[in-house]
Amino acid sequence: MLRQAQQPKVPEPVEGPTNRINMKISKFIISLAIMVLAFIAASCGNEAAYLPKPRGYFRIDLPEKAYTRVDTIERYSFECPQYALVTPDPYSPNEKNWVNIEMPQFKGSIHITHKSVNGNLSEYLEDVHTMVTKHLQKANGVSDSLIVNDEHHVYGLFIEMDGKGVATPMQFYLTDSTRNFVRGALYFNFKPDNDSMQPVINFIRQDIDHLINTFEWK
């Protein structure tokens, strides 16, 4: 009678220190992979939250156009917007013909100075040229236009400068060439970003044009 040969018993693997370390490494790798996948999935799901938002500006309400005659200055008069306030220059109390046109809602003002002409008109024109040249260092561009009003003997130049950091985006001078010389300049009480302030600058430009067109000597 033949007997079936018995299979030899295979010894069970003994869990040694090396096997335990390998198992721990495998579990760590699996856990790390799960964490990475979860982080990627969360990042993709919230991707829209990290997109940069478009730049915006505060809305600026512009007042209605209306003007009144300013006739309290000794040497000249003009029409001024009703939303503005004309005040004497606080830093030059002895100069009765120096005024500020204050625009508090825009945090700006137009400074107007007056000088008498006694054969020295070229000196005043040179001063204007020097001041404009200083501002040009921060300007991207400059444009100017002649002012000619033969009826009221008002002649001059209007100067406009573009660019961030320009201290005065608009200035002008007026003269009758024999007795009077007036210079005006727009300033803001903060460092303006002229790009974002462009609607206000354009609005004030219209008021300066009106001031020049209604300017008269006394």
Regions found by a protein language model. Name each.
Residues M1-Q4, P13-N46:
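Sec-dependent bacterial lipoprotein signal peptides
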Residues R3, P104-F106, K115-V117, D162-G165, ...:
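Short, flexible beta-strand-to-coil junctions
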Residues I25, A42-G108, L121-D127, T133-K134, ...:
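N-terminal targeting sequences that direct proteins away from the cytosol to non-cytosolic compartments
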Residues V36, K107-I110:
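Short, charged/polar, Gly/Pro-enriched secondary-structure boundary elements
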Residues T113-N118, D127:
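Extracellular-facing segments of soluble proteins and assemblies that are Gly/Ser/Thr-biased and enriched
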Residues E126-R183:
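Signature of long, low-cysteine stretches enriched in small and polar/charged residues
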